[in-house]
Amino acid sequence: MPIRVPDELPAVNFLRQENVFVMTTSRASVQEIRPLKVLILNLMPKKIETENQFLRLLSNSPLQVDIRLLRIDSRESRNTPAEHLNNFYCNFEDICDENYDGLIVTGAPLGLVEFNDVAYWPQIQQVLEWAKEHVTSTLFVCWAVQAALNILYGIPKQTRQEKISGVYEHHITQPHALLTKGFDDTFLAPHSRYADFPAALIRDYTDLDILAESEEGDAYLFASKDKRIAFVTGHPEYDALTLAGEYFRDVEAGLAPRVPYNYFPNNDPTKTPRATWRSHGNLLFTNWLNYYVYQITPYDLRHMNPTLE
């Protein structure tokens, strides 16, 4: 889907350099079709980088996707210019009376922070409660998965003693699931998290369908039977160099991190890594848009009355 974004958004030029089809609002306005309305709650500190990554994954299909960016943290950002936030982001109050076809909630570097100590935890709870009645399908990524499992299912925070970082192999567990349609039986995906997602825990606490997991028994991809919510515990949106940037940042901070697993050629941080997960990342988001959003959302969003009860 060509993504529909404001003409001045920096991602437009960035993605066009990669030959990614981005449709500006001015061009999209002359097409007489209803675009899918997708809201992205961006919790990452480097918001522009994260925008580029998610918009890239949402761009590869023939229908329009109208993107709106949401922020819920009113504190001054150290990583994103205030002008960018003011120009391209909305607050919850701006959209709380609207309905959306899809919602994506990104990860956040909060793996070692207790939920009640997260500055915007009440706002996260508010958005998830709102989404039950106002969004057709919501996709949670990495830390947002842990937050959603706690809010929606009461699952306690599970934290690993050591951060998992690297590119790990996973296998699909339901061969005919729509969200993994077109996937290889085994595939790679990057992870960067302290959160722990044992598949057994998900099965014990919920009726969610686990669609893919790691060889170590960690759930990677799972979803509700009604397609209203989906969870991906890794970072399929990451660029080839994102894990490297995190690793060298931690090295410079004196944290002595482990070299990301299965990432640098010959496990040598001086060598340039390559993205080995890109095709499955694209498939995941394309499948979510098609089967979890487009196929079940109403044409007239005013008539939507979904429920997770």
From Swiss-Prot:
SUPFAM superfamilies: Class I glutamine amidotransferase-like. The record marks S192 as: Important for substrate specificity. GO terms for molecular function: homoserine O-acetyltransferase activity; homoserine O-succinyltransferase activity. Its EC number is 2.3.1.46. GO terms for biological process: L-methionine biosynthetic process from homoserine via O-succinyl-L-homoserine and cystathionine. Substrate binds at K163, S192, R249. Disulfide bonds: none annotated. Gene3D superfamilies: 3.40.50.880. GO terms for cellular component: cytoplasm. This is Homoserine O-succinyltransferase.
